[in-house]
């Protein structure tokens, strides 16, 4: 997978972009967990390659709280693996505050999502992201909603991005719903009304 990921960086550069968004799985809260070292090694190799190509693997937030992800990224000593901040994933999965996450992860944010949702009840990220088997996946633990209808405080989120000087992309993400295209249009109007 590491070599395949390097080829994806090559392709991205050929397409004249320097950000590749991805999921890496669940970073364990405990750095002594065996998976932590494996993830550090793999991401360290990818970070070094991305750095050499002046590119970024942007890890999408969600499976862990911001402080855990920051500690993991700090251990790489590189910006080659950075952050695609998805505020709804914090709300829906970990219950972490996406506004505070902007400040915590400010040195690593290279891409962001505009997505909204609500957590219905807690399910371990280890289960949600397939690290552990469970029947709980059959029971919806969160719901993605049109922008402005969930629990993400978008005025505060946009203020935080502005506070840290973020000037990159803000990608509207809508994966579900009866009218995703209509929801995306409404989301664009909603964002314009706030910025």
Regions found by a protein language model. Give the residues of each.
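Histidine-acidic metal/acid-base catalytic patches
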Residues: 16-18, 44, 52, 66-195
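Active-site acidic/histidine proton-transfer and metal-coordination neighborhood
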Residues: 1-83, 92
């Amino acid at each position: 997978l590491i070599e395949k990921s390097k080829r994806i960086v090559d392709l991205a550069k050929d397409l004249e972009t320097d950000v590749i968004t991805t999921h890496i799985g669940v970073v364990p809260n405990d750095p002594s967990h065996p998976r932590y070292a494996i993830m550090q090694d793999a991401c360290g190799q990818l970070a070094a390659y991305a750095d050499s190509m002046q590119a970024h693997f942007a890890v999408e937030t969600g499976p862990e709280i911001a402080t855990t992800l920051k500690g993991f990224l700090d251990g790489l000593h590189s910006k080659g693996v950075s952050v695609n901040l998805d505020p709804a994933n914090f709300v829906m999965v970990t219950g972490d505050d996406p506004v505070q996450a902007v400040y915590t992860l400010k040195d690593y944010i290279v891409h962001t999502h505009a997505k909204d949702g609500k957590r219905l009840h807690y399910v371990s990220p280890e289960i949600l992201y397939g690290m552990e088997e469970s029947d709980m996946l059959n029971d919806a633990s969160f719901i993605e909603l049109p922008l402005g209808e969930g629990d993400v405080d978008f005025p505060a989120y946009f203020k935080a991005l502005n506070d840290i000087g973020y000037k990159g992309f803000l990608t509207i993400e809508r994966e579900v719903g009866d009218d995703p295209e209509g929801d995306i249009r409404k989301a664009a109007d909603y964002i314009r009304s706030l910025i």
